[in-house]
Amino acid sequence: MTAAAPVITIDGPSGAGKGTLCKAMAEALQWHLLDSGAIYRVLALAALHHHVDVASEEALVPLAAHLDVRFISTHGNLEVILEGEDVSGEIRTQEVANAASQVAAFPRVREALLRRQRAFREAPGLIADGRDMGTVVFPDAPVKIFLDASSEERAQRRMLQLQEKGFSVNFDRLLSEIKERDDRDRNRAVAPLVPAEDALVLDSTSLTIEQVIEKALQYARQKLALA
């Protein structure tokens, strides 16, 4: 029996820098990449493309089970490919966001997508970006990292991102939203946002992104050399 391809899981709250870290690690190691946060949006978009009713669990399950999606990181940019087409921009529309929240509510859809996410595990290896990658999706991953940062730092980063896009934002409101989301995520009954017992907890509050990438790659290479 062939050994399963290695997986590096990167979990953590919104705004900690998971996406940037995962893209950098996938490029550095030349591994596959899974952006689990985007997968419900991709399924929602596939349903809209194929005129599948997003309110029908029965109709969505087979679509979820055979979802043709890939994630490609090039020069720090993430391309989301659905059925051979780059849909990176399309999955960010409000219509798709609304549909994604509907499809995510169905238990059988979540189960089908769990199996679909596990199918990303292919040689030479996988970088899995999410919130429950190390605890639920890939509990046997040889390398698990939980990337964290203070809520204030994450609000600051989000504010700068939005300002760069021309949006006017209120820091206190952003901070309040982040704290509320953290509370929901950490205390939910199913797959709460907690570090796996065997995860390295990496606090990025006072680190540059280059320092985070360096520490994560160093840790991963050490662990994989021992595995």
UniProtKB/Swiss-Prot annotation:
The keyword S-adenosyl-L-methionine does not apply. Disulfide bonds: none annotated. Gene3D superfamilies: P-loop containing nucleotide triphosphate hydrolases. It holds the Pfam family Cytidylate_kin. The keyword Transferase applies. Its main location: cytoplasm. It is an enzyme of class 2 (transferase). GO terms for molecular function: ATP binding; CMP kinase activity; dCMP kinase activity. One of its GO terms (cellular component) is cytosol. It comes from the Bacteria. GO terms for biological process: nucleobase-containing small molecule interconversion; pyrimidine nucleotide metabolic process. InterPro entries: Cytidylate_kin (IPR003136), Cytidylate_kinase_dom (IPR011994), P-loop_NTPase (IPR027417). It catalyses: CMP + ATP = CDP + ADP; dCMP + ATP = dCDP + ADP. HAMAP family: Cytidyl_kinase_type1. Belongs to the cytidylate kinase family. Type 1 subfamily. This is Cytidylate kinase. The lineage of its organism: Bacteria, Pseudomonadati, Pseudomonadota, Gammaproteobacteria, Enterobacterales.
